Amino acid sequence: MTGRENVKFVSRLFSKKDELYDKINFVEQFSELGKYFDMPIKTYSSGMKSRLGFGLSMAFKFDYYLVDEVTSVGDEKFKKKCDVLFNSRHKESNFLMVSHSMAVLQKYCDAALFIGRHNNINYYDSVAEAINKYKENEGL
């Protein structure tokens, strides 16, 4: 399946028929894959797959996004582009994030779950408090 075919398939699940072209166009432009957008995904590098996946997830306006380290994708120019779009989505949506970037977590999160050694789970109303617990737990 090519990048375009994948985007078309997913778009059929999450958008109206008259929005299909706009979704495909958004992902094609945003991901900056060029000719690779029409090539099989199995030929993509991990970075290309991440760009396609991030662009595809951002093509839809959801109430909640599940985010796993995706903001670290690509070169500096692409990261800035992701950050601008992320900020836009953050104004109208919520994020459930997994990240090793403390700055990203502090920027986008209002509360935190910290899963420590032995799978101990703790909820924190303060992201800063969760980060301190993480650092303490990791000996940082």
Report each predicted region and the residues it spans.
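Conserved beta-strand-loop-alpha-helix hinge in the C-terminal portion
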Residues: 118-140
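ABC-family P-loop ATPase nucleotide-binding domains
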Residues: 1-52, 56-76, 84
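Conserved catalytic segment of ABC-fold P-loop ATPases
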Residues: 107-114
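Conserved H-loop
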Residues: 101-107
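Short loop/turn elements that form and flank the Walker-type P-loop nucleotide-binding site
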Residues: 37, 60-61, 90-92, 108
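Conserved catalytic loops of ABC-family nucleotide-binding domains
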Residues: 85-97
